[in-house]
């Protein structure tokens, strides 16, 4: 039996998703909780391996288990064993050909910036702080050259292990909601640190450090050293993973909860 679950987590206190010996990770916490429910060892596969400090509102995972458990038991049972900053939101039994990573057709991230003169207290681990005034309209304008299929060498980390720098960005939008500036970006897949490096470049444009046309110059250069600093991890959220309709996965509100849909 193959089960898919949607998981939400605050990544502030974790060394990313992927299990690593001697480190506190999301995957280890989730597998521990599910193994308790199954009364046997469970290994999970996720849609997107988020980095240290990165959050998710709708991470999708799957696992195989022959134990007879209802979806309600998987959800509520796992939540009873999970730490308070991780929860299972939804679940469904899936066909054997479903794969949380390889069946996905797109992934959507949001990068949230608190743009105010004073650093935030309550949201300090959940947003990136920029005290310089950002013009979200310039950021939106600059980001449009990244749409479509491109070589994103300038926006990948030096540790990126992908065989190709080619990715296809389906949509990129920058909006302002009071003091919050939100980068919303969807692509078929992302390179290591790609969203954070795009955010760094657009922040440089929004603050007036570079002109709008500089974004395209960085893209065309295919050189990571010519871009901006990588934006911090704690403003980044995996908010949606899209699959073919045949799988019937619920599309939850992207979130995070302190944002609203426009």
From Swiss-Prot:
Keywords: Isomerase, tRNA processing
Family annotation (InterPro entries): PsdUridine_synth_cat_dom_sf (IPR020103), PsdUridine_synth_TruA (IPR001406), PsdUridine_synth_TruA_a/b_dom (IPR020097), PsdUridine_synth_TruA_C (IPR020095), TruA/RsuA/RluB/E/F_N (IPR020094)
Residues reported to bind substrate: 109
Catalytic site positions: 51 (nucleophile)
GO MF annotation terms: RNA binding; tRNA pseudouridine(38-40) synthase activity
Top EC class of this enzyme: isomerase
Highest taxon listed in the record's lineage: Bacteria
EC number: 5.4.99.12
Function: Formation of pseudouridine at positions 38, 39 and 40 in the anticodon stem and loop of transfer RNAs.
Subunit structure of this chain's protein: Homodimer.
Protein name: tRNA pseudouridine synthase A
Gene (name only): truA
